[in-house]
C-alpha cells in the first residue's frame, strides 16, 4: 500500500454546510452583482461556491429563456397583425384593379367606336355594300339644326 504524499486539504478544512453562508433567496441571488456574490461566497467551500454559482446560472438562464419566449410571442403577434393588414390591402388593391380594368375596357370600347366613326366620316359617303356588319353608326342631318353640331351617341 502506498500513501498519498499530499494529503487532501479539503478534508482537513471541512466546514459544515451553511456555517458561514447566509441563506439567499432566488431573487437575491439573481439580482446581486458579481462583486456582491463574490463577497457572499468568501469563506465557503468549493462545493458550496460551485453549487451557488450553478444555481445562479440556472436561474439567470430561466429568466433569459422566459424573456425570449415573451419576445418571440410578441414578435409573432406583431407579424400576424402585419400579415392580416397586408392581406386586406392586397384584397383592396385587387378590387381597385378590377374596377379600373372594367373602366378601361369601357373606355377602350368607346374609343374604338369613335375611331370607327371617324374613319367612316373621313372616307366620305359609304356605299351600302361597304358598311361593316359588326357596327353601324347612323348620322341624321336635320335642316333645322344645320348651324349646330349633331349630337353623337355610340353603343358601348
Swiss-Prot record:
Keywords: DNA-binding, Isopeptide bond, Nucleus, Phosphoprotein, Repressor, Transcription, Transcription regulation, Ubl conjugation. Residues 79-93 are annotated as: Leucine-zipper. There is a cross-link at residue 130 (Glycyl lysine isopeptide (Lys-Gly) (interchain with G-Cter in SUMO2)). It is found in: Nucleus. GO terms for biological process: negative regulation of transcription by RNA polymerase II; regulation of transcription by RNA polymerase II. Residues 51-114 form the bZIP domain. The modification Phosphoserine is found at residue 25. This is Transcription factor MafK. It comes from Homo sapiens.
Amino acid at each position: 500500500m502506498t500513501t498519498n504524499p499530499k494529503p487532501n486539504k479539503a478534508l482537513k478544512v471541512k466546514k459544515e454546510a451553511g456555517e458561514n453562508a447566509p441563506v439567499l433567496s432566488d431573487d437575491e441571488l439573481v439580482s446581486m452583482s458579481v462583486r456582491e456574490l463574490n463577497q457572499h461566497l468568501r469563506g465557503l467551500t468549493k462545493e458550496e461556491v460551485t453549487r451557488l454559482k450553478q444555481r445562479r446560472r440556472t436561474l439567470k438562464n430561466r429568466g433569459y429563456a422566459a424573456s425570449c419566449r415573451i419576445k418571440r410571442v410578441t414578435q409573432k403577434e406583431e407579424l400576424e397583425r402585419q400579415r392580416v393588414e397586408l392581406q386586406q390591402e392586397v384584397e383592396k388593391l385587387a378590387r381597385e384593379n378590377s374596377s379600373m380594368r372594367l373602366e378601361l375596357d369601357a373606355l377602350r370600347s368607346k374609343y374604338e367606336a369613335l375611331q370607327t366613326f371617324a374613319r367612316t366620316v373621313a372616307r366620305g359617303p359609304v356605299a351600302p355594300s361597304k358598311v361593316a356588319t359588326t357596327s353601324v353608326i347612323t348620322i341624321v342631318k336635320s335642316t333645322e339644326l344645320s348651324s349646330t353640331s349633331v349630337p353623337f351617341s355610340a353603343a358601348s
